[in-house]
Amino acid sequence: NMLVSDYFHKEFHVPYDSIAVIAGPCHAEEIALERLSYLTVGCSSIDHAKQFAKKLGNSFIKTSVSDDVVGIEYGSVLKNIYAIAAGICSGLKYGDNFQAVLMSNAAIEMNRFLNVVHPIERTINDSVYMGDLLVTGYSKFSRNRVFGSMIGKGYSVKNAQIEMEMIAEGYYAAKCIKEINEHYRINTPIIDAVYNILYEGISPVIEIKLLTDSFK
């Protein structure tokens, strides 16, 4: 349960200002098609972030920089869990209206989590957080959404993983974040619901119904 930046720093003694992360609404499938996409480069050294961003940018990839490495890393993990939740709801035949409510509450929950584990000033509506959350939750290219949809349709976790032949990172992320949150005790009902469905074997129908009663 260690962030990638922390792992490289602790295990290989790489200075934090030499570690950069990239995130944003940027599916590889659309990059291959040269469709306009946006990336944020996160590094504790903004100068280094700008250097990396300059090398990554081109006519169809717009780049920006941030020093919120921890927030970006956690956001990139959390959005996969929320995408599984979105997929589960889709598999259960909830419509677009509820999907919008789910993602709105996911953004609130993500912001709450980030503000506790790494309390700095950030704008959750920036594309590196909100944009990545939305594209992962809605896109047909999202492995995590597809995985969640299969769970919502009644597949077991094992059968969904076998049939997908791809890794849905959110499955593993749900367990990691659940364990991390044992220390922080943050209110994360969506993450808890996904964890209960995937690891405790609780019915998706029951867990999502509980969420519908708590959302605004």
Predicted features, each with a name:
Residues S104-V117:
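An active-site-proximal "capping" alpha-helix that borders the catalytic cofactor pocket
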Residues F52-K54, F60, S64-V65, L78, ...:
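Catalytic, metal-anchored helix/loop core of enzyme active sites in primary metabolism
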Residues A32-K50, A86-V101:
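Short beta-strand and adjoining strand-loop segment in the mid-core
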Residues P25-I31, S59-A83, I120-M130:
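Conserved Rossmann-fold dehydrogenase catalytic segment
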